[in-house]
Swiss-Prot record:
Record-level Gene Ontology MF annotations: acyl binding; acyl carrier activity
Name this polypeptide is given: Acyl carrier protein
InterPro entries noted in UniProt: ACP, ACP-like_sf, PP-bd_ACP, Ppantetheine_attach_site
The encoding gene: acpP
GO cellular component terms, semicolon-separated: cytosol; membrane
Subcellular compartments: Cytoplasm
NCBIfam families found in the cross-reference section: acyl_carrier, PRK00982.1-2, PRK00982.1-3, PRK00982.1-4, PRK00982.1-5
Entry's Gene Ontology BP terms: lipid A biosynthetic process
Domain Carrier span(s) in chain numbering: 2-77
Family indicated by similarity: Belongs to the acyl carrier protein (ACP) family.
The UniProt record lists the keyword tRNA-binding: no
Amino acid sequence: MSNIEERVKKIIIEQLGVKEEDVKSAASFVDDLGADSLDTVELVMALEEEFDTEIPDEEAEKITTVQAAIDYVSKNQ
């Protein structure tokens, strides 16, 4: 597991209060991990802070799964 993947998963676990084993690459924040719209906004803000980047709203809307978050951060580091 890459350092970025580990960091993204750690943020998801902390922000959504889910178990590590539930945070699979294909997991949807809303459908699989029980996030609501506020959770997803806070999750994006936590990713921005952790990786010292700004995620535009139109990009943030596309980050709906664990893998999408990992991919976005990996491409925009």
